Each structure stands twice: as C-alpha cells, then as structure tokens.
C-alpha cells in the first residue's frame, strides 16, 4: 500500500487530489493550518474505500520547518514510507501592484508559496533519500512560464522561483540518488476555486476584470476535472524532472478555437 502526503489539502485542489489518490488505493495524509477545515476533510476522506485505505490529518504550517518535519514523521510512523509528497499549499496575492503591498503581505506570499515549497522539499528529499525512493511534486502557477500581470507580480515571482528550485533540485537528486528520488512539477493550469477570487484566505472577494473572466471561462476547469487527469499520471510517472501538465498548449489552442461554439460561464455572469 502506497502513501501520499499533500500540504494545504483541507479544501480546493489539495483535497480533490487527496480524494482521487484514496480512490486509487493510496493511504492519504492531508495537512493544513486550519484545523476545522482539516477535520471536515478527514471525515470526507474516511468515507472513501474505508475497507482497504486509511487517511490521516496533521495540522501543519508550511512556513514552519519543524511542522513539516513532524508531518513527515507522522506519515512515516503511521504508514512506514512516504511514496509521494506534494507541495500544494499556496496563497494568492492581494489584487494590488507591488508599490501598494505592505511588507507583511509580500513576506506572507513568499513565505508560503516559495519558502513552504523549499522547506517541504528539503524534508521530503531527506526522508526519501534515506528510504531509497519517492516522488516530490511542487505545484506550478501563474508566473512559472514567465507570464506577467499587474496585481500578480509577487505571486508570479514566487511561482517562477518554485519552478527554478524544483528543476534544480531534480538535478541534485540525479547527482545524489541517481534519480531514485524523483523531483517533479505539477502544472494544473487555471483552476476555478475561491483561490482566484480571494487573497490569503481573506473573506473579502476580489472582483476579477471582465477580460480576465473571459480568459478563465475559456481556459479554466474545476479541480475535480483536473485531478482525474493528473493524479493517474503522477502515480504512473517513473521519470525524474517530469512535468505533469493539464493545460497543454494543444488543449489551450483547442479551447480558444472552439470558444465561440462552446460557451462556458464559471462566474454566473450570463444575463
């Protein structure tokens, strides 16, 4: 029985991944900073294949390296080994240009989106190197491909750095483990969750520009759709430095090509 650990997985894309992994026969360890959300997520997971899979929840702040080590230790103690570790935890940035962001807002984005991935990868790599195998996935996002937009500068900066870090760590793994520890990227594309309409978990809604909504309606997908594609490919992957991509160039081109015939409205704006 294999085990997956997912950070930031009490809701949204992380929880959808957890459910799909459990449906696929994995023991699942979810983690989040919000204990109430975590308990609700655990109850949902425990109803999936209860006869032959297990779920565990661990409160974890990814900006705290000790929390991440305790997350690994809890998973290893419960299930023996950790086969897949996913750095999923992330926050959006307030919809403001850099000159209007506070130092606290800047630090929070970098601490969660970048440092959280670095700290999580460090813990997972050490554990997987010791056990002799494993896969580490870090979630890419807007900015990973050098895309730029006012209001997303700090988020994009963090995600671009995550891409460089992950690819460089994959090279280190090749040198140190011969690729036994596979360090990879997960590129889900545009997901329709409250992540894109709220910043830092704030209840205040971000009203997206109409142009942005139009693009999201063409290219976006619900996380349930995305995990049906990416999770089986993560499970089957045997390559170090792999990139599991949902919104490929071909898929994006097809969406734009058919946008005039297939109307999609994720924001309920149709009159």
Question: Model-found features: residue ranges?
Answer:
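Canonical Rossmann dinucleotide-binding motif of NAD(H)/NADP(H)-dependent dehydrogenases/reductases
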Residues: 1-29
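A short, exposed helix-loop element centered on a Lys and neighboring polar residues
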Residues: 121-122, 167
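The beta1-alpha1 cofactor-binding region of Rossmann-like NAD(H)/NADP(H)-dependent oxidoreductases
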Residues: 35-36, 59-70, 103
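Substrate-binding pocket helix/loop in short-chain dehydrogenase/reductase
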Residues: 96-98, 102-107
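C-terminal helical subdomain
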Residues: 185, 203-262
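Catalytic loop of short-chain dehydrogenase/reductase
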Residues: 135-161, 166-167, 171-175, 190
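Conserved glycine-rich Rossmann-like NAD(P)H-binding loop of the short-chain dehydrogenase/reductase
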Residues: 24-41
């Amino acid at each position: 029985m294999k085990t997956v650990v997912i950070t930031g997985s009490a809701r949204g894309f992380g929880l959808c991944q957890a459910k799909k992994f459990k449906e696929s026969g994995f023991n699942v360890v979810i983690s989040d900073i919000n204990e109430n959300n975590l308990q609700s997520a655990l109850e949902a997971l425990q109803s999936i294949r209860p006869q032959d899979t297990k779920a565990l929840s661990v409160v974890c702040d990814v900006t705290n390296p000790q929390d991440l080590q305790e997350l690994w230790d809890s998973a290893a103690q419960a299930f023996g080994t950790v086969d897949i570790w996913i750095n999923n935890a992330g926050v959006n940035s307030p919809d403001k240009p850099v000159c209007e962001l506070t130092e606290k807002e800047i630090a929070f984005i970098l601490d969660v989106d970048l440092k959280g991935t670095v700290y999580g990868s460090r813990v997972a790599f050490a554990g997987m190197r010791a056990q002799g195998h494993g896969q580490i996935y870090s979630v890419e996002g807007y900015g990973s491909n050098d895309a730029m937009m006012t209001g997303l500068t700090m988020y994009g900066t963090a995600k671009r750095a995550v891409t460089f870090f992950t690819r460089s760590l994959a090279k280190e793994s090749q040198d140190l483990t011969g690729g036994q520890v596979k360090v990879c990227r997960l590129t889900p594309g545009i997901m329709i969750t409250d992540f894109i309409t709220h910043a830092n978990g704030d209840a205040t809604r971000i009203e997206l520009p109409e142009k942005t909504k139009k693009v999201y309606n063409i290219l976006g997908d619900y996380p349930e759709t995305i995990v049906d594609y990416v999770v089986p490919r993560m499970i089957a992957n045997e390559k170090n430095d792999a990139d599991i991509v949902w919104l490929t160039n071909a898929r994006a081109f097809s969406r734009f090509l058919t946008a005039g015939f297939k109307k999609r409205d994720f924001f309920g704006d149709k009159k």
